Amino acid sequence: MAIHLYKTSTSSTRNGAVDSQVKSNPRNNLIYGQHRCGKGRNARGIITAGHRGGGHKRLYRKIDFRRNEKEISGRIVTIEYDPNRNAYICLIHYGDGEKRYILHPRGAIIGDTIVSGTEVPISMGNALPLTDMPLGTAIHNIEITLGKGGQLARAAGAVAKLIAKEGKSATLRLPSGEVRLISKNCLATVGQVGNVGVNQKSLGRAGSKCWLGKRPVVRGVVMNPVDHPHGGGEGRAPIGRKKPTTPWGYPALGRRSRKRNKYSDSLILRRRK
């Protein structure tokens, strides 16, 4: 979708850049309420993920990540905004009367036809196993476990690439730069996720950020020593350490956060950047 630039009529709209209007009129049988508890806190009520809280109430849209309506063509009826993700979603009317939401593929418009199955065309929005795709195909919504539904490359603008097939496995290059093996029988959707220009948006004011459930970010160097290892000192002072740390004293900016000795380590041929 196109990016709309605000006219500078007030201070809050200065330098603002948002998406052109995308309607949100979800079907009642494809949404349900969700209790957003925690706000970045663990079971003891301690903040473990900062800068979260508040925000507008949301209704969760049921997204079809499995694409298990096999060999039944569907038509794109609407393209809608989803408050739970940065990608758009589109409503599909299938030939058997089923109605489902899927992630909006880039370039898809209202009226286009999609289908999933084993012997379907390699065209945008179609879902099929990796074994039936030619090398170099751009894909998204990729399964890791057969039948579990897509788990990889689902964010706005995300796209992976099929680079090799050997034996029972296919080699993919993921959006993070990681190269890993996936079973050739797993399903994936052809094309790139839409809303590629999401990073070009500028909310323009703090209130718009609060609506999204994101709270202000405060630097540790301006805190007190009791609140952050970087805090304290007279006036503007350095952090007083060799390397930056988290509020809990662990190394920040570059520390590997992946758990060691995971079963999937053998499937990763090259780590993410």
UniProtKB/Swiss-Prot annotation:
Keyword Plastid: yes
Key words, A-Z: Chloroplast, Plastid, Ribonucleoprotein, Ribosomal protein
GO terms of biological process kind: mitochondrial translation
Gene3D superfamilies given in the database record: 2.30.30.30, Nucleic acid-binding proteins (2.40.50.140), Ribosomal protein L2, domain 3 (4.10.950.10)
Subcellular localization, as worded in the UniProt entry: Plastid, Chloroplast
Pfam families to which the protein is assigned, alphabetical: Ribosomal_L2, Ribosomal_L2_C
Superkingdom, taxonomy of origin: Eukaryota
SUPFAM superfamilies: Nucleic acid-binding proteins, Translation proteins SH3-like domain
Gene Ontology terms, MF aspect: rRNA binding; structural constituent of ribosome; transferase activity
GO cellular component annotations of the record: chloroplast; mitochondrial large ribosomal subunit
Main location: plastid
Position of the signal peptide: none
Region annotated Disordered, chain positions: 1-25, 224-273
Protein family per UniProt: Belongs to the universal ribosomal protein uL2 family.
Complex formation: Part of the 50S ribosomal subunit.
Name of this chain's protein: Large ribosomal subunit protein uL2cz/uL2cy
Organism annotation: Phalaenopsis aphrodite subsp. formosana (Moth orchid)
